[in-house]
């Protein structure tokens, strides 16, 4: 498949490995985005609505959650990976491989997404929340029917940024045998001084990231109303 | 229905303290349309916002239907609020939703069936004249159109109580009048209670039963619209009344006074209720032989009766005028001679 | 976990084995897997990007064997973590070398020179021992396979040691006076170890011979034994020599010999 | 000074096209206060926003001082815009800046010395009555207070042209009147040109020289305020004029009509300018011996003259009334008998 | 200094090393935040103002910058590190060490900050920009006196998120001998199985991140006006 490339940049890896690693990346990013997105949005919403003066003001929850997120964001990814091994094994049956990597990736991206979401949600006009409150909306309705839709455009951009961050993080998940393009780039390209592999994997990553960003930009723009 | 009991609300910003509400007591009876008027910054919005707890009073309490909302549990509070529609001064529309969905929002909150929502929203949009904007987003609307969406949204659930904060401030007189008529209509048909903030005396005149005047966080005067208009006590109230019943001398009267003709006098008669001028006119014209002209007159139609002033221009020989002046002094309508010095233009 | 029940295998009734490797060791394993597959052993290669996880995963039964480490690192690791693992065969040796773009011999290295060493613990220990061998440093007596810069007894030339990731050493050589580089990496980076190195680990450095490790209970498992045999076959030896162009030297010694390095 | 030449502006949203401005031609002369009135959604904001290119017209051009802004280079355009103050319908204040800094912003843009800024802003804040709010942030202000900050900001640089989009919509009559007086004052003193959007006819009456009425993106009528008020041509214009000069029958008149007494007739006299009623009164009372009462009267004072209506209540034997009716038919004031059927309440 | 700790968690590293690595982290994060902050804000602002319909609409700039940022965000950090070696050497004289690490860190964080800033700036009310335009503000004034101050609260949260991201990235900069706490945590704690070191370094990281986040939250809240 790649034989037609000039020698200097012809990768030393098989196209099967490349395709497989592409699949692994998509698989890891997809699943961990799903979970960390849900968790991150939940945490982000909680961080916003429990803060002083907000609709579900709860000093205890806010002041517990806030540092927990900070702690998770403090730990270097590799150490997080290790610290989570027992939990990963309990959850996934195994602590190695592509599937197992989803757990630490979720722990990595969840709190990160929470922070981005928090920032987006704080920009919602307080008047909107007042209107919701005055209509007798329940707290859940205020969140799901007012705050989230109003912040949607910014949320989509935040999720885009987070997704691209996840793509980057999968490269590190190679430590537990997760594979993925980033890992191939590092182990075959970088460590083996194989410029061809480096080039093609980085190109693939660029295509992925470019695609994700375009998708994010377009969908965010489509729902932006100002 | 709505009762404010010694409500005080202070805001702190930096080392400044603003007393937006200062020991306010107010009672709005069921089915009443109660207007609150006052200068900009008087505390009107704060008052109406504390009715549904958007602002928690610093002290005092607000009762709706005899219930202090502040004592309710979350779910009960939501239920209570669903019975209170609110029109916001700054509209507070959802930017992310179409006009249709904005109006539908309160209905969706109560899980109204889709078909019912469609019917009700269509009806409301057609009433506020925005059927063709159903699929537009708020940012594509003009100021008045946004306000009308806010009105439609507040009415969507047929609330028992309606809180209107400057509901017609961005609207032309024609639209204002049709909105006010609608409010009056639902007030009569459904016995809905309306608390209405406004800075326009004409709004009060048009639909309110009672009115309170606010200044610096205090209610300085209140009463039936009729009594306030006919007999304002506080200078601020008078200013508002004057905004639709001018009390300054009309230009034509001032002009006439400037000519200082000896055989001409100008009298002002204040009209209250059903006063009759027929005997006054007859006496002046027939008995004294005075030439009587109506120089200027402004009357306001307030709930079926007329209030205002008439300026009569009397011309005759000075001695006849002097004679008539004695007659006029004892006349029950108490005509006052206008000399140009006594009053200052507003 | 155990492979016990799977002593019987044939091409029609294949047995599957998971082997953990790190980074770049896959070519020979792909080659071995092809050979083994014909005999009914399906090798699944699990690639790690780290030197801790493969042993952990082996002990936890997530893989059946691993092949990525030197015997000294292995011994140290199982002692530290109290793991019941055993070395079941030797594989290759990739000697370490000291390279410089500025100096032709170790003696030329001046006072206060900066030398890069690997930040990864076992390799760092090897780096320091090579520097001791070259006469640049003196290490503590109890210097072990994961000892680091804090175990330097004497640094007469006041050499500044900078810890970096191994793969960067060839790339950063010109920024320092000398760099310690793994053979594998050196060859990949286009260096010729016997010619370019100004100091080289002796080829018989037993502690740094790589091994295949398995759980002790599986030490005698015929499947694993067969895999060791395949690795140590001439066919594979030739393959490795060609593939790595001398950077990685197939080194097949007995287990006794393997375990008899000085500790 | 400001000239709109065949300006058209269309908005597209989805498959809908809205023509907000439809071939508008308008000329505002230097030093003029030009009012634009129209129903909500008529295109007023779009018109004023195209004056300083906040909306680029789809076709046609806008000239300010004879210059088409659209042809200017970036720097020249900025300079031109610094001469045009604008008051926004939705205020557009900087949330992140204090009241003081909001008003100071346009001055800072031109690098005005600090001391001058302080002086000017203090002066403006005191004028709009918000000196005590200098250090507050916009979100701590009431609706009317925000609007006043917007006004102060627009005036800060003493612009030559002022564009006001509903500059007083959130203000009480007293504040409105003081703002309008200020605008009139700077208009006279500095010969500043003002284009003023409003939906309140009273604003037009108070300070405008000329007025244009918009409907559905078109200017349907324009002229001097006097001519428009006294003689509105288009039904929409009439509606606006009627908003301050009610044309519907007053309640008291309607009530009187309902009684249908045979010896009572009600006549309506339209007052335009300096009309005199003295001979009418004398004839009716003295010649016919009719009992004449003034049932209701509303007159407006527009630039020195009075416009409006008087309702006379005539009581006498039917045959006398019949006789008088012939006399009245030929009277130059053209009194019209009101029967209750002819007119419908507005 | 650390001898009083119970043996199980007494780190095997000297307190000098710890202090030095702390200094290195602060040094790297400080400088790279400074540069990447400036660059990120510049890029973020450019991304916003050159997009279609905005004040400096420029299709060429926007459509060039957008993918360049994506490319930089695509490359795994370790590969970015390597790819930049010649540039770093040219700029810093050496491609090794704490100072040299600033270059790749800036390349890593700059585009990332750009994306966060972009999202924050897009939330500024268009009415504010209209008001600025109507006042005759120059493009630069619109950006610096209107858009940036109005977005300040959200910008501060974005910068906080980015700074914490930078702290995480410094752990990876160890690859070129940059040192820092994250690196000590990985090489001394994780690789040498020194729980004491792991604990103390991670604790230090937590303290740093917690401090940064609190600082960000507080300053953002102070300037938030809604
Ligand atoms: N961005 C937009 N997209 C689509 N339609 C728009 C947009 N802006 C304005 N319109 C439409 O153009 C018409 C004129 O709007 P404009 O704001 O000029 O009205 P207006 O006369 O100022 O009304 P108001 O008195 O209510 O402020 C309205 O029908 C409005 O819905
Ligand atoms: N959050 C706040 N912080 C500080 N002061 C406030 C706050 N909200 C309102 N105020 C002040 O309280 C006073 C009353 O404000 P309010 O909004 O009730 O006035 P209003 O009568 O509705 O005026 P308008 O007619 O202009 O809308 C004003 O002086 C205002 O500046
Ligand atoms: Mg208000
Ligand atoms: Mg408008």
From Swiss-Prot, chains B, D:
**Which ranges carry the ABC transporter domain?**
2-241
| EC number per UniProt | 7.4.2.11
Molecular functions (GO terms): ABC-type D-methionine transporter activity; ATP binding; ATP hydrolysis activity
User: What is the predominant subcellular site recorded for this chain?
Assistant: membrane
A single GO CC term for this protein reads: plasma membrane
Its localization reads: Cell membrane
The question of whether Cell membrane is a record keyword is answered with yes
Keyword annotations for this protein, in alphabetical order, are: Amino-acid transport, ATP-binding, Cell membrane, Membrane, Nucleotide-binding, Translocase, Transport
Query: CDD domains per the record?
Result: ABC_MetN_methionine_transporter
InterPro entries cross-referenced by the UniProt entry: AAA+_ATPase (IPR003593), ABC_transporter-like_ATP-bd (IPR003439), ABC_transporter-like_CS (IPR017871), ACT-like_dom_sf (IPR045865), MetN_ABC (IPR041701), MetN_ABC_transporter-like (IPR050086), NIL_domain (IPR018449), P-loop_NTPase (IPR027417)
Positions with a binding annotation for ATP: 38-45
Top-rank taxon, per record: Bacteria
Annotated membrane topology is: Peripheral membrane protein
Q: What is the reaction catalyzed?
A: L-methionine(out) + ATP + H2O = L-methionine(in) + ADP + phosphate + H(+); D-methionine(out) + ATP + H2O = D-methionine(in) + ADP + phosphate + H(+)
Query: What sort of enzyme, by top EC class, is this?
Result: translocase
Q: Which family does it belong to?
A: Belongs to the ABC transporter superfamily. Methionine importer (TC 3.A.1.24) family.
Q: What is the role of this chain?
A: Part of the ABC transporter complex MetNIQ involved in methionine import. Responsible for energy coupling to the transport system.
- Assembly: The complex is composed of two ATP-binding proteins (MetN), two transmembrane proteins (MetI) and a solute-binding protein (MetQ).
What is the protein's name according to its record?
Methionine import ATP-binding protein MetN 1
Phylogenetic classification of the source organism? Bacteria, Bacillati, Bacillota, Bacilli, Bacillales
